[in-house]
Each structure stands twice: as C-alpha cells, then as structure tokens.
C-alpha cells in the first residue's frame, strides 16, 4: 500500500486526538448491538457487552494494542499481524467479515468522537488504514 504524506498525517491526527480505549470499547458495544451474532465469538463475556464492562474493556485493550502495532508499522502492516491472523483463523475461527464490521463500527465512533474534525479527507485516510488492518488480519485465511 502506498501512503501519501497527507494520508499519514491524517491517520496520525486521528490516532493522536482520540481516546483509543474509549472509542474502541464503544465500537465493540456498537458491534454487539448492530450485529448481535458477533457475540457468539465472545462466550467468555458472560453476557456483558457494554463499553463499560470489564470484559469489553479488556478486549478493547487488545484491539488498541493491535491498532498501535499497525499505526507504528503503517508502511508494512502484514508481517506484524501474521500470528494474530493465525490465532483468529486457527484457534478462534472468526469469520474475517467480522473484522470489516468492527472496522465500520470503529469508523462511526471516530466520527462521533472527532465531530467536525472527521472530514471527508480524514474519513478516507482512516478507511484506507482500516482496510489495511482488515486485510492483514484476514491474511491467514487465504
């Protein structure tokens, strides 16, 4: 993936201006509300699917860690996601379409958090970043 300097700057702006943990936890809650079948992958949550629940907070932390890796290696994400992709495929049996659903929910929450700063240009750059992450997570499925 080729990134322009402007795209990287826009992704950086999103990353540095948001409370990652809060936004990802809200995105997970949105995922569970809008796509309730995704809860089947989270049996250990024991029915606790709200952003404030400790189970969601813990998983949000894992998602934030993965996004941080992607952000820090924006020019070469795939090699850094090999093990995570493999885990989701071989151990967790997660349908890779769900990565896209979470990415979409995250984009909605970022738009809500950034309001007017979430311009069409920012949205396009973040969407590109999300697609790179989703592709890297889905690599083990190919």
Curated annotation (Swiss-Prot):
GO MF term set: haptoglobin binding; heme binding; metal ion binding; organic acid binding; oxygen binding; oxygen carrier activity; peroxidase activity
Tissue specificity of this protein: Red blood cells.
Family annotation (Pfam families): Globin
Keywords for this protein: Heme, Iron, Metal-binding, Oxygen transport, Transport
Coiled coil: none
Gene3D superfamilies assigned to the protein according to its UniProt record, in alphabetical order: Globins
Residues the record lists as binding heme b: 59, 88
GO CC entries: blood microparticle; haptoglobin-hemoglobin complex; hemoglobin complex
SUPFAM superfamilies from the UniProt entry: Globin-like
Superkingdom: Eukaryota
GO terms, biological process: hydrogen peroxide catabolic process
Occurrences of domain Globin (ranges): 2-142
CDD domains listed in its UniProt record: Hb-beta-like
Subunit structure: Heterotetramer of two alpha chains and two beta chains.
PANTHER family for this protein: HEMOGLOBIN FAMILY MEMBER, HEMOGLOBIN SUBUNIT EPSILON
Function: Involved in oxygen transport from the lung to the various peripheral tissues.
Family: Belongs to the globin family.
Protein known as: Hemoglobin subunit beta
Gene name of the record: HBB
